[in-house]
Amino acid sequence: GVPCLCDSDGPSVRGNTLSGTLWLFGCPSGWHNCKARGPTIGWCCKK
């Protein structure tokens, strides 16, 4: 999957760990949406 920035990772992608994974059709079972706003396409989810 494509890594994405969760709210808990910090305000920007620079110098922060991207702990989320981008899913186009919502988070799979057992995962949760970890970003309150965005991304434009898909959902940023983590286990």
Curated annotation (Swiss-Prot):
GO biological process: regulation of signal transduction
Gene3D superfamilies assigned: Anthopleurin-A
Pfam family, one: Toxin_4
Coiled-coil regions, chain positions: none
GO function term, MF aspect, one: toxin activity
Keyword list, A-Z: Cardiotoxin, Disulfide bond, Ion channel impairing toxin, Nematocyst, Neurotoxin, Secreted, Toxin, Voltage-gated sodium channel impairing toxin
Predominant location: secreted
Compartments it resides in: Secreted; Nematocyst
Cystine residue pairs: 4-44, 6-34, 27-45
GO cellular component, one term: nematocyst
Family indicated by similarity: Belongs to the sea anemone sodium channel inhibitory toxin family. Type I subfamily.
Task of the protein: Binds specifically to voltage-gated sodium channels (Nav), thereby delaying their inactivation during signal transduction. Stimulates mammalian heart contraction.
The protein's name in its UniProt record: Delta-actitoxin-Aspp1c
Species: Anthopleura sp. (strain 'Zhanjiang') (Sea anemone)
